[in-house]
Swiss-Prot record:
It comes from Oryza sativa subsp. japonica (Rice). This is Replication factor C subunit 4. May be involved in DNA replication and thus regulate cell proliferation. Induction: Down-regulated by sucrose starvation. InterPro entries: AAA+_ATPase (IPR003593), ATPase_AAA_core (IPR003959), DNA_pol3_clamp-load_cplx_C (IPR008921), DNA_Rep/Repair_Clamp_Loader (IPR050238), P-loop_NTPase (IPR027417), Rep_factorC_C (IPR013748), RFC_lid (IPR047854). Expressed in roots, leaves, shoot apical meristem (SAM), flag leaves and panicles. GO terms for molecular function: ATP binding; ATP hydrolysis activity; DNA binding. ATP binds at S56, G57, P58, P59, G60, T61, G62, K63. Gene3D superfamilies: 1.10.8.60, 1.20.272.10, P-loop containing nucleotide triphosphate hydrolases (3.40.50.300). Its main location: nucleus. It is found in: Nucleus. One of its GO terms (cellular component) is nucleus.
Amino acid sequence: MDASSSSAPDLADAYDIPWVEKYRPTRVADVGGNSDAVARLQDIARDGNMPNLILSGPPGTGKTTSILSLAHELLGPSYREAVLELNASDDRGLDVVRNKIKMFAQKKVTLQPGRHKIVILDEADSMTSGAQQALRRTMEIYSNTTRFALACNTSSKIIEPIQSRCAIVRFSRLSDQEILGRLMIVVAAEKVPYVPEGLEAIIFTADGDMRQALNNLQATVSGFRFVNQENVFKVCDQPHPLHVKNMVKNVLDGKFDEACSALKQLYDLGYSPTDIITTLFRVIKNYDMAEYLKLELLKETGFAHMRICDGVGSFLQLSGLLAKFALVRETAKAS
């Protein structure tokens, strides 16, 4: 599909609301990916008796959307008065747990038999240990009337007493096909002009994060009115994978000086070493090479990333990484 085969969107209407919100699923069944987790939540919606839940997984995988959809399905028109949602932008210290959450749990709301009020705590792993201890007690006292749903990136940061009171539902990063499926729905609805390589670039930059994919798509359409590879990488401000791939190819072909020049160009463009090494990791992961070679390159990339995160001479570390790559190549040739 080319630019001429689809009209540009009406920009006056297209950006009134972020596409992440505009196309957020309203039913649990419509949540993309993580079929096992979604199936468990659908069972809860059918049964009507929701346990306390911990939804754990990387950002942008559908945790918050799933629990909001579940709350809508369980409570219907009573949703507004029977749900308390607190996210990372809200103060969720000890006072909030003792006052706001406790007052909500004490509030009388008329619901269908077997239904409960729901407290949704987004990014619960950022709550202090003291607040979590207070929450544990509140969960215990009001278990007959109120259920709690905690969304977090890592469940290990939730204290054990809360974990033991909850059913844990784990979410994983979405596959490229799952992200592409949702992007195609949005592209068709918004009449976005695109080329397939542009959507591939969005999937690459999203790295399994649906929220990131939709934000990148909307930002590209907003800035350039057309989704192609070049525009996506300009908007996302990430090193172009083709440049990084050529750099790796030069090392593996024995053209070390050319690889160093390519690295210097990327560095001079203002990309952070973390951006460069993250793109490098993804490129190597998908690069067609001998398995032994790929394993060694990934190992060296991991060590270099660790040193860069410690703040050690970043450009020097990247140059040293290319030298390690060349050494691995020579060792592989000798054997």
